[in-house]
Regions:
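Polytopic transmembrane helical bundles with strong interfacial aromatic enrichment
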Residues: 1-128
Length: 128
């Protein structure tokens, strides 16, 4: 198990719920239709990659290689901050240049999934 990643996943899950509630209740009248859609996309990817981070943290228990799983966790953490963070800020602030940053976060998220696959491929076969 990658303990730090599981702790970060717990904190990220707490933040994802808080931001989702804030977006649904605190910002619903402030954001236009496009702003709500952008905020919802940020929230959805935040939740999905919080769960990915938790799974990646526990994958070595199931036999996945530890180093690729650590890389996956780091990439998902950075990717979530850059991808979802830029979208949250774009939705709230309307600063269009933030949209140019978002794809870099998406790329980190994709590479994280690839690294999880590498970890599963390289790890020893474990029967649970």
């Amino acid at each position: 198990m990658i303990r730090w990643a599981l702790i970060v996943a717990a904190a990220s899950g707490l933040l994802a719920v808080a931001l989702g509630a804030f977006g649904a209740h605190g910002l619903e009248h402030m954001l236009g239709e496009r702003g709500r859609a952008v905020f919802d996309t940020a929230s959805r990817y935040h939740f999905v990659h919080t769960f990915a981070l938790a799974v990646g943290a526990m994958a070595p228990i199931a036999g996945a290689g530890r180093k690729p799983c650590v890389a996956a966790c780091i990439l998902w953490l950075v990717g979530t901050i850059v991808f979802s963070g830029s979208l949250y800020l774009l939705a709230i602030s309307g600063l269009g240049w933030l949209g140019a940053v978002t794809p870099f976060g998406g790329l980190a998220l994709m590479i994280g999934w690839f690294m999880l696959g590498v970890g599963a491929w390289r790890g020893p076969e474990v029967t649970l």
